[in-house]
């Protein structure tokens, strides 16, 4: 058989035409997920394609200092952004990060001989949807907490729900309606007084970047959705990453191996009380490189500007559309009522007009 020998312009035209047959974030809005979707800058693809990053994960530490340095640097970036003591990069997705964080919570309660007692995880109705499944997979009974008339966590109902059986409260702040939990400090106190842990779902971290940190609000564990906040690819089934940050007293339970700096060198080590591995090696390396490059490129001022524009864009859109918005004030997103219109028709219209 004679292989085809098309000219380069023909090949370029062919693949360009194929790309135009698919829908992508370059063609229009990408409204997947309850989070702030955005354009991912293409420079991070160049960074991830560098040959220096293509090393074998079993290479000895002394010959992988650059790679370990990036992993350690990303841990430090994320911990600082979230107000945590440290972080693990191993979980391969946001939901996997939730599962990992809850396994850390179980290990903590087990270390206090309370694992058999603390069998419940409280999840508000306004929480990110995966929280319910993650808690169940971690072996917990899920207690759903209805929202109050303002769309937030009702403090009175929370006080009745917590007790000696409470392992954790999972909270998304701002929540799926874009509402900030204004009673967060009181909520944290209620959970901690009952002996539970406060878990932060980072789905909506875009609204807080550079302006507020979950750790300062009283959260003990959090996961970061790098595909929602730090410009890594979204959707498609992976590969992905869902780093988990924790406060100091929970650090010893994080997955192994961990990356640390000692005497000016980076090394891997296994904490004695680790929950073990949740993914191969240090997670999906090239995804993590993209998140590192994005954070390093923006810096403190850039991250702060990102959150400002996320909130500004949502509020600008709310002023422009003619729909009923029952809750507010909101941050990076809002929920609107379609009224007599069909929500599916609205979505199709957005695609038709490239809104």
For the regions a protein language model found, what residue spans apply to each?
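Conserved N-terminal alpha-helix of the aminotransferase class I/II PLP-enzyme fold
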Residues: 8-11, 15-21, 51-92, 97
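Terminal amphipathic helices with adjacent charged low-complexity linkers/tails
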Residues: 31-59, 323-355
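Active-site C-terminal subdomain of aminotransferase-like
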Residues: 221-332, 337-339
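Gly-rich Lys/Arg/Thr-decorated short loops/hinges at beta-loop-alpha junctions or inter-strand turns
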Residues: 49-62, 80, 136-146, 165-170, ...
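N-terminal glycine-rich, Lys/His-bearing helix-loop that initiates the first secondary-structure elements
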Residues: 1-52
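A glycine-rich phosphate-binding loop feature that marks nucleotide/adenosyl-phosphate handling sites
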Residues: 31-40, 91-97, 124-127, 204-210, ...
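Conserved PLP-enzyme active-site core in the AAT-like
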Residues: 66, 96-263, 340, 344-348
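Conserved phosphate/anionic-ligand binding catalytic regions in large, soluble enzymes, centered on
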Residues: 23-44, 90-101, 230-245, 282-293
């Amino acid at each position: 058989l004679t292989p085809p020998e098309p000219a380069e312009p023909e090949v370029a035209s062919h693949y360009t035409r194929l790309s135009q047959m698919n829908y992508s974030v370059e063609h229009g809005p990408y409204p997947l997920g309850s989070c702030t979707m955005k354009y991912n800058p293409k420079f991070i693809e160049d960074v991830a394609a560098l040959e220096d990053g293509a090393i074998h994960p079993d290479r000895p530490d002394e010959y992988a200092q650059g790679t370990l340095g990036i992993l350690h640097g990303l841990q430090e970036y994320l911990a600082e952004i979230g107000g945590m003591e440290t972080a693990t990069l191993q979980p391969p997705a946001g939901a996997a990060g939730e599962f990992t964080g809850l396994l850390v919570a179980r290990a903590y309660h087990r270390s206090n001989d309370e694992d058999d007692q603390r069998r419940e995880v409280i999840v508000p109705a306004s929480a990110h949807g995966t929280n319910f499944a993650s808690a169940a997979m971690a072996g917990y009974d899920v207690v759903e907490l209805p929202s109050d008339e303002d769309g937030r966590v009702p403090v009175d109902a929370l006080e009745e729900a917590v007790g000696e059986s409470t392992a954790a409260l999972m909270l998304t702040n701002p929540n799926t309606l874009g509402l900030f939990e204004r009673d967060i400090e009181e909520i944290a106190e209620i959970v901690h007084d009952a002996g539970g842990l406060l878990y932060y779902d980072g789905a909506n971290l875009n609204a807080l970047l550079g302006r507020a940190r979950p750790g300062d609000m009283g959260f003990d564990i959090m996961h970061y959705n790098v595909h929602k906040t730090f410009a890594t690819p979204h959707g498609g089934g992976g590969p992905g990453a869902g780093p988990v940050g924790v406060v100091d007293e929970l650090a010893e339970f994080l997955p192994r191996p961990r990356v640390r700096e000692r005497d000016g060198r980076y090394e891997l080590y296994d904490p004695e009380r680790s929950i073990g591995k949740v993914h191969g090696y240090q997670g999906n390396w090239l995804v993590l490189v993209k998140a590192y490059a994005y954070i390093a490129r923006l810096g403190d001022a850039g991250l702060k500007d990102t959150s400002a524009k996320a909130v500004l864009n949502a509020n600008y859109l709310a002023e422009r559309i003619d729909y009923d918005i029952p809750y507010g004030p909101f941050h990076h997103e809002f929920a609107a009522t379609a009224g007599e219109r069909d929500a599916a028709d609205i979505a199709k219209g957005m695609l038709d007009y490239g809104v």
